[in-house]
Amino acid sequence: MVRENGVPEVLLVHRPQYDDWSFPKGKAHEGESDEDCARREVGEETGLECVLGVRLPPVFYESRGRPKRVSYWLMEPRGGEFTPHREVDRIEWLDLDEAGERLSYDHDRDLLAAVTELL
């Protein structure tokens, strides 16, 4: 999440394998904390180094018949640069309304609503 000119924007990633738009996320390595996983996954997917802010409500959904729980934080980018790769070929900073239209999944729109309430 970043504020440009007072307008909150969120970062979305496009995953070509699924042709979807979502928030950066991923799986924790064994013994890795949720916080370290969040920083690592955002870095791997976007190339950005971020500082964690407020922890958001967990998101629960089903993927390929298995339940998923994902932890998210508001984050502030501090550096880095995106380079397209196999997992994520595009990123976009969008205002909250644009992000709601672009997101591919209802559970991500629910998370966006929680973010909107915090701002």
Task: Give the role of each language-model region.
Residues M1-F23:
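N-terminal strand-loop-strand
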Residues G26-A114:
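Unchanged
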Residues T116-L119:
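Charge-dense polyanion-binding interfaces
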